[in-house]
Amino acid sequence: MIQEYQLRVLPEVAANEQRLKEYLIHEKGLNAREITATRILKRSIDARQRTIYVNLNVRAYLNEMPKEDEYQHTLYNNVEGKPQVIVVGAGPGGLFAALRLIELGLRPVIVERGKDVRERKKDLAQISRQQLVNPESNYSFGEGGAGAYSDGKLYTRSKKRGNVDKILNVFCQHGASTSILVDAHPHIGTDKLPRVIENMRNTIIQCGGEVHFETRMDALLIEKDEVKGIETNTGKTFLGPVILATGHSARDVYRWLAANNVEIEAKGIAVGVRLEHPATLIDQIQYHNRNGRGKYLPAAEYSFVNQVDGRGVYSFCMCPGGFVVPAASGPEQIVVNGMSPSNRGSRWSNSGMVVELRPEDIEQFTIDNLQFTISMQHDSAANCQLPTVNSQLSMMYFQEYLERLCWQQGNMKQTAPAQRMVDFTKKKLSYDLPETSYAPGLVSSPLHFWMPSFIAERLSKGFQLFGKYSRGLLTNEATMIGVETRTSAPVRRRSRRSCTLCSPERRSCVWTPTRSARRMGTKSSCGSLKKKRSRSCSAPRWSPRAWILRTSRWSASS
């Protein structure tokens, strides 16, 4: 017999299987001889009151042993000889797109500008040790993408974007801890994630797919309104339908799209700083205990959000027991991010603290503020004209403006400009700075002075509000480190028909394999795609070469 229980127990009970069994015996009246096994299905921490509890969903097995695996396996068949699809980018989007293509009977060919997940480590070390940023291999580019070496959190509030449990199961199938199936805020950890990513790549190759590293897409091949494939920096072309999974930092791709009349537009982003506290202080605040988290609780997390002058100010990508890392993807930039190892054992905890920014918010910035970006255009974007502040790339150029300004304030190295938290709210220069986890080092700088006022003033007001909610958070023990700009992509596709993945103007089509195959086709017994029309609208027919993209003006994935 199997029975499930919703329990609210003390941390020491949740952490010990024997004590959990004793709790079930005494509180739920179970017979000790009948309990053969227990399994925790879900786990979350309730730290709203002084006494901390752990909420558990527990399955008890009575007079029988568990038969099912802790996670569900996905079957990946061999796709050698099947029609190939080009996937540009080997980040999480590209890797999962490739795995989904295999499920659909198509052969993925991944093209990644950076290095494999192990070789990337050398280039990441160079950023801290020698202040050198390899524009093709860094925290943003390379196998695993931006998340491979920046934490590996797997938390989403969205409930409408597909089967989240399947994603977690795929991670477990490739070596992640099964704890991610249980915890309310799943976390793999920067030290564990590279092995998982490597295993995912091996699955793709073993099933007949290909992965090409240090191969950058320079242009899409378009003939007679059809995307035929891609051109790369190696001189090699790859033919087939194309999925762009290039991430939020591939600005040369955005420039190419804009220069070739792709239907994209500027979208809202969030920018701000990394805020770093001593981990013991955050534990004391969140767990309401001067002694911190004790033996049975993990490093404490926090989440803050408020409206300030009509814009959201909120914490982002909180990394308990983590490190602040240099995440620039090119020269003359400073960008910071956060990461945590799986044990979250660092002496510091950090989080992005960002302000919501909309395209209309930067209208006050004239074209003169953005002139420096001309020199930052590369390769296929060399002939791209500098956009106005209202153009489709305006938010991207604003990101570049802040990142270069931050680099200048950091003595034109990867030493990041920083300021104590209370000093920032009082508009005072910090004459010294606390110890930090940021390896390249910090330099004291008046962030309140050089950051755009519509960002700095909202951050200051937000910090004061958060300090009222959580006593002790607003302190000069905390350090603001600039700047955090890569919270999301600065462009998106323009509006399209709701019933297809087509552009409203040109019947241009983008299809990603994670979408329901029901819209575009079903897999036949021989593994081919049968194209179908949508019942709700008149969608165009596609040639076999245009499953993914078709037309000279096509929509781009954001």
Regions picked out by a protein language model, each given a short descriptive name:
Residues 2-52, 58-149, 153-368, 374-382, ...:
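Residues forming the flavin
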Residues 485-558:
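Inter-lobe coupling/hinge segments of SF2-like helicase ATPases
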